[in-house]
A protein has these predicted regions:
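Acyl-donor (CoA/ACP) binding surface of acyl/acetyltransferases
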Residues: 1-33, 37-47, 80-226
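A short helix-loop-beta-strand connector motif used in the catalytic cores of GNAT acetyltransferases and
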Residues: 54-55, 67-82
Length: 226
């Protein structure tokens, strides 16, 4: 087992440091800020995310999705985190913290790990609010979750999927050193897609790329450019 992997685990930590971000398990308290970010980002998200509809900007929809995320977490099939930008946090007096014990900071987006039935792959997926793009946040979060995903029991590889036309999303696994395993046809689900899905893979046994930190949480991980 590579040195940067720990012992296999059924579930990941509920809170992780990821360079400029804190990744925290999504909770009902996050529904309002997620709904607001989706609403402000619909034009940015709609070309690539089939779920990016006006209904997704409703807090009631997000409360339902948080409940679904809780069920996935408890069954060990999906693990959804909110990304909070620590580098945007104002200074606070020693010994104080924001709500839920997190440092103050701005919501950036969400990222998740998904187990696939009868498969040893763990898929990482993410979205970033339109006001927070091009700051390295998705790269930092995916960098932190890659070794965490490989620590899940039975995980043999990590995958990142994106349509071939979504060059911004594809730049993230490429930057991190993932291998483009294949491009396969798929049904177009969002208007910007070409119907050609890129499957980027990180196999168990590969060592982290230069600049990656040791340890499952990626505590010292360096922020990327995208």
């Amino acid at each position: 087992m590579p040195a940067f992997l720990a012992r296999p685990s059924a579930t990941p930590p509920e809170r992780l440091a990821a360079g400029p971000l804190v990744l925290r398990r999504v909770a009902a308290d996050d529904a309002a800020v997620i709904a607001a970010a989706v609403g402000a980002s619909l034009e940015h998200l709609r070309p690539w995310m089939a779920w990016a509809t006006p209904e997704a900007a409703d807090i009631r929809t997000q409360l339902l999705r948080v409940a679904e995320a809780d069920e996935l977490w408890e069954t060990g099939t999906g693990f959804i985190y909110v990304m909070i930008a620590r580098d945007s946090a104002p200074a606070r007096p020693p010994g104080t913290a924001g709500s839920r014990g997190d440092p103050d900071g701005e919501f950036v987006g969400t990222i998740g790990m998904h187990r696939r039935a009868a498969d040893d792959a763990v898929e990482i997926g993410y979205w970033i609010a339109s006001a927070k793009t091009r700051r390295g946040y998705a790269t930092a979060a995916a960098r932190a979750l890659t070794p965490v995903a490989l620590e899940l029991s039975g995980a043999g590889r990590v995958e990142i999927h994106c349509d071939e036309a979504n060059t911004a999303s594809a730049a993230i696994p490429r930057r991190l050193g993932y291998r483009l395993d294949r491009i396969e046809a798929h049904e177009r689900e969002a208007p910007g897609e070409r119907g050609r899905r890129m499957i980027w893979v990180w196999d168990r046994g590969e060592s982290p790329a230069a600049g990656w930190s040791a340890g499952p949480a990626g505590r010292a991980a360096r922020s990327g450019a995208g």
